[in-house]
Amino acid sequence: MSERYPRIRLRTRFGGYWIHEGLRLDFYMRRPHTQMARAVMRSMDTYVNAVGVENFAFYVDEEGDPQELDAEGWALNRRKLLEVRWPRVILEEASTGAPERYHFEYQGRRIDDPELPVSAKHACVASFWLPSEYLEEHGPE
């Protein structure tokens, strides 16, 4: 096994990057969102506090459009996590023309509703992205 991971960088002609290595942690939870909401909010808060709230500038609204992640945007997304039966929350960093480094995404599912045809593969999913530089700075601890 190598001590170093491969650097994967595809440069644009303007000096930025289209592709950049990093780590994406996806958690698939076979539990109804109603049982997961508070734990997901704590996880989101822990992640945002660890990487810095300043790294997030937008959230994605119900139409799929980016909206400014100001105090009102934070409150709206927290309410969605706690009050909506199957929320979708996406937090993104400011668009700089570079690949995203920090990203949080959660898709809640109603897997406990007997009225809905539910696949055995359905689950709530939380995703946390970290750039390789963050991992190098903070080490394995």
PLM regions with names:
Residues 1-58, 140-141:
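C-terminal interaction module
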Residues 43-45, 50-140:
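Internal, hydrophobic cores of structured domains that mediate oligomerization or house catalytic pockets
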